[in-house]
């Protein structure tokens, strides 16, 4: 797949984006969900080795192809690793899946009801390395806990500044200002976020595009103006703590928004499964998320 093919696939392809980008902090939880206790490994190297085995098993599964999975978001160590003897991004591209990389370095402490992204001093070097490996885009996450306009405006400003740096590095940014679905002010936070993103999009130069990864809104259809915006390549949704059936029901209510699920994709997979069981379970999850993304049919 050339750059133009990847852009076209992400812009209008039928399917969803798999999020396989758990980082150091969330890896023990991901492994536990997969059926591997913390006592089964010692030290980061063993931990990352196990999570890489899990991701390799997913990526090489017969169901994990570009037919239903448009793209996959990787953690930096996964990007630098190999699958079937090939660099992970190349292995994905071979399967028709567009590679993205998570670039943020975690969250600052909460202030003004939000958590900004920590500084990324080595971002240009990472972007250059990712570009060299055939990666198409990036993803960067911050979190909104309360409907504080000052805080949300600061989050959006920071996200679009990082996106500009990503575009300058030749990659497509996925901007992810996650609204905490447990927030007591969720609906108001969704609305303020929409307004601030629209302002930032209008300020982008003509011809520039970004992607958006957003929490499923409390009010269905709220993000229609973003789906229709010429400066947005695609709007994707995170599962944000919803279990897969619930996430798919919510997703199906939102026109033009496709999934970019992590936990909701992987929640039924277990280390102990035979390959046959594992592949069947993953195929079932992919089908369910595909239908909610494309056909807008909740499971």
Please give the residue ranges for each predicted region.
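Alpha/beta catalytic barrel-like cores
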Residues: 1-136, 144-146, 196-299
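Eukaryote-skewed repeat-based solenoidal scaffolds used as protein-protein interaction platforms
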Residues: 138-212
């Amino acid at each position: 797949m050339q750059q133009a093919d990847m852009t076209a696939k992400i812009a209008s392809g039928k399917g969803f984006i798999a999020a396989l980008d758990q980082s150091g902090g969330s890896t023990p939880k991901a492994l536990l969900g997969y059926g591997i206790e913390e006592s089964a490994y010692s030290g980061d190297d063993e931990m990352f080795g196990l999570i890489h085995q899990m991701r390799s098993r997913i990526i090489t599964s017969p169901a994990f192809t570009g037919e239903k999975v448009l793209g996959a978001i990787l953690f930096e160590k996964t990007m630098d690793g190999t699958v079937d003897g090939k660099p992970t991004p190349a292995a994905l591209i071979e399967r028709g899946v567009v590679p993205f990389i998570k670039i943020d370095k975690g969250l600052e402490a909460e202030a003004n009801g939000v958590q900004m992204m920590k500084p990324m001093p080595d971002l240009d070097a990472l972007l250059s390395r990712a570009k060299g490996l055939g990666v198409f885009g990036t993803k960067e996450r911050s979190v909104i806990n309360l409907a504080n306009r000052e805080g949300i405006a600061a989050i959006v400003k920071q996200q679009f500044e990082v996106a500009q740096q990503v575009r300058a590095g030749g990659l497509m940014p996925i901007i992810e200002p996650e609204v905490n679905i447990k927030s007591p002010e969720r609906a108001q936070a969704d609305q303020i976020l929409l307004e601030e993103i629209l302002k930032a999009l209008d300020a982008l130069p003509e011809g520039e595009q970004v992607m958006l990864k957003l929490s499923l809104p409390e009010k269905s259809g709220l993000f229609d103006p973003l789906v229709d915006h010429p400066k947005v390549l695609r709007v994707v949704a995170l599962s944000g703590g919803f279990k897969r059936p619930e996430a798919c029901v919510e997703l199906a209510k939102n026109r033009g928004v496709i999934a970019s699920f992590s936990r909701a994709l992987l929640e039924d997979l277990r280390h102990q499964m035979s390959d046959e069981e594992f592949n069947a379970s993953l195929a079932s999850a992919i089908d369910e998320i595909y239908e909610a993304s494309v056909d807008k049919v909740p499971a």
